[in-house]
Amino acid sequence: MTPRIWELVGLSTLETLYMGFIATLFAIVIGLPIGLLAFLTGKGEILENRRANQVLNVIINIGRSVPFIILLIILLPFTRLVVGTTLGTTAAIVPLSVSAIPFFARLTANALLEIPSGLTEAAKSMGATNWQIVTKYYLPESIPILINGITLTLVALIGYSAMAGAVGGGGLGNLAITYGEHRNMIYVKWIATIIIVLIVMLSQKLGDHLAERFDHR
């Protein structure tokens, strides 16, 4: 392998990490409140609202059901509107984020369902407001499961970023197609694959470690 190929491998790896981490950040910032509301408006919860809960769940389920490659195509006009182009790593972050938001929202709602059922009553008996119940009881109690959800989201996005790269999104997927396939450099495809596997394994290991650290049960 030439120094130029190694340089491209390094750059493509950084692009993949950039897409994965930024899209995960958007998923947390937007998906967490949506998932929280989906849980809080559920039956028997502090903001119980059947209509709002149904609407939120429909939005989340529709968002999760659209295959990423189709979402990528559907969002081309929106991506161009937001970043001015449909090519490159920054452009790829738009569909990656949109796909990850409902995914993480569902993981958040499911994480909150793991909270002991008597916690709300105990908090209310001590005079806690709804805001205090959420910030001092629900979220701290669900941190380990939320960390697992963040890890799962990042791992999924690393895989999606390879698909985005295959259609001009940059990263290791684009490297594998451009050099590994079109220029018949088979070893480039293998290197890109191995690096993606290593990123996923390291992300999972780090996520598991953090979840264990925050789990005080």
UniProtKB/Swiss-Prot annotation:
Statement: the UniProt record of this protein carries the keyword Cell membrane: yes
Membrane topology qualifier: Multi-pass membrane protein
Annotated Gene3D superfamilies: MetI-like
Residue intervals passing through the bilayer: 20-40, 58-78, 81-101, 143-163, 184-204
Alphabetic keyword roster: Amino-acid transport, Cell inner membrane, Cell membrane, Membrane, Transmembrane, Transmembrane helix, Transport
Domain ABC transmembrane type-1 per the UniProt entry, residue ranges: 13-207
GO cellular component annotations of the record: plasma membrane
Coiled coil (UniProt feature): none
Location relative to the cell: Cell inner membrane
InterPro entries, per database record: AA_ABC_Transporter_Permease (IPR051322), MetI-like (IPR000515), MetI-like_sf (IPR035906)
GO biological-process terms attached to the record: D-methionine transmembrane transport
Keyword Chaperone among record annotations: no
Disulfide bonds: none
Pfam family membership, one: BPD_transp_1
Primary localization class, coarse: membrane
Family listed: Belongs to the binding-protein-dependent transport system permease family. CysTW subfamily.
Function (record text): Part of the binding-protein-dependent transport system for D-methionine. Probably responsible for the translocation of the substrate across the membrane.
Protein name: Probable D-methionine transport system permease protein MetI
Source species of the chain: Pasteurella multocida (strain Pm70)
Source taxonomy: Bacteria, Pseudomonadati, Pseudomonadota, Gammaproteobacteria, Pasteurellales
